[in-house]
Amino acid sequence: MSRYTVFMCVLGALGASVCDASALTLDEAYASVSLSPPTTRMVIVCHDFGCAQRTPVGLGAGDHATLSSLLAPGRASAEAERKAVAAAAAWFDRRVGPEAGTTRRVARATGLGGQSTVGQMDCIDTSRNSTSLLLILEQLHLLRHHKVEGPEARGFVLDGRGPHATAVLTDIHTGKQWAVDSWTHKYGERPDVIPLDVWKQQS
């Protein structure tokens, strides 16, 4: 099994999330936070920062049909598939939000300045949830041009940038990696899907 970078968050004294990265297998990554990997029938949604709260959401035939419809335009090319993935991610956020209590999720939630973490998501939550969605798409055989990778991180205190994590896809034709980052957008909006090397240079 391939190695990947997994991120765990703890709440700091000021309420900000502090991210630590370590190389783990996919199984180890989910086990490290006592989280079951997604299946086509069930996904556990992380929220309230650092996956402090987990809400199981059942998925059925109707959900599978919706995802299939959303990914259908992506069959044409890798670029089209990335656009379709973004549309699926926005739908997924709206699908699980009412059950997880995250319908008022804001963009770039930090927990600083007294900001409540209830119903919000930090980058650990969004990167893990996005990775779970991507794995579901893979399990449903809806990804033709990409494979799912583990989350990647950028930034740490010493380089002056706050830690941040994102879900990742690899274009199977070119090997180019792409960030799928929903933390930068509020509830129900499409995530950024940009080259991972570009994402890593951002702050």
Protein language model regions, located:
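Bacterial N-terminal signal peptides
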Residues: 7-17
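Acidic/histidine-rich, surface-exposed loop or edge segments in extracytoplasmic proteins
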Residues: 47-79, 105-116
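Hydrophobic/aromatic-rich core segments of domains that either
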Residues: 135-199
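Positively charged n-region of N-terminal signal peptides that target proteins for export
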Residues: 1-4
